[in-house]
Amino acid sequence: MKYTIPGPNVKLFGRAVQTLTKIGDEVYVIADDRTLSLKAFSASRSSYMCFSFERSFFSTSELESEGYRGKLSARSSLLAFRSVQTLDRTVEECVVELTGDQALVSLRFRRGLTKRFWLPLIEYEELQFSFRADSYVRSVCGQAKLLSDVLANFAVNVPEVTLRLSPDRLDVFTHLEGADTQRSVRTSVSVQAAELDDLQCRGDAAELTVCLRGLRAALGFHEGLTVRLQLDEPGMPLVGRLDGVPGLEATYVAATLAAGGRPLASSVAPHERRPARQCADTTSKRHRAFLLGLTRPPLDEFTSQLPRDEQVFAEASDDEEG
């Protein structure tokens, strides 16, 4: 598999990689005859984001009939797209080549300079993320910048926020439990329906509590895009879609706190090497936080899964033509 990304789209591709590394520790690469998809799952497998690039996004593409599936560590993926702010002005094109054991990323700069990054693949794990949003009757649509500005009012150490959608406005406020409500500062931000592109709320107002970190990362992908958030009852996943770039589809799905301790409606089913976690029937704060990806495993579990005997190789060459 070989894909050539034109200069104006390199920045978007790099932003997608950076966004996925904020969601999870691994980037899944899946290619077929129609799209190249990059996916990431949170450590607790309770949130998910996918960028699907259609063939029109690339200037050229060389495909294989059997498709491609691979997995990269997030840390190694960042090496090739570290300075995305200047990529559209300095890079003429980016070539991504996928082979059986590695991914080769070539950045061809102006004046003939080429940088190459060999990113080794790690063991692939088949994951299936299931969710359905076709029956949702509540949604809010607006500019990603507006919603990002709303989330910017919350401190980085706030783990969860609650979204309340009513027929006339969207409220976002800090989620607190138990005795914390007596001693903690609570932030609330309201957006009137007139400030949004679209607001649909059939029936009563709905409140959903989600992880702030993942939602902030998804909305921060590109402030110029339009985002639509679909909501349902507590325990049903929040589904977000970003639109505005031809040939690119971005989807974010996050689990929400279940009412009455019911299991979360969205789940990931790994293959037999990593059994699916069982949701205990408890409403403890730690249990809820684990389901939303808010509790962190030991530090060594967050390090890259790059094999110790393999390294990411980078090379720069001056291919300037006479």
Model-derived regions: residue spans:
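DNA polymerase sliding clamps and clamp-related checkpoint/processivity subunits
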Residues: M1-T21, V27-L146, A152-N153, R164-G322
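Helix-loop-beta junctions that constitute the ligand-sensing/allosteric loops
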Residues: V158-E160
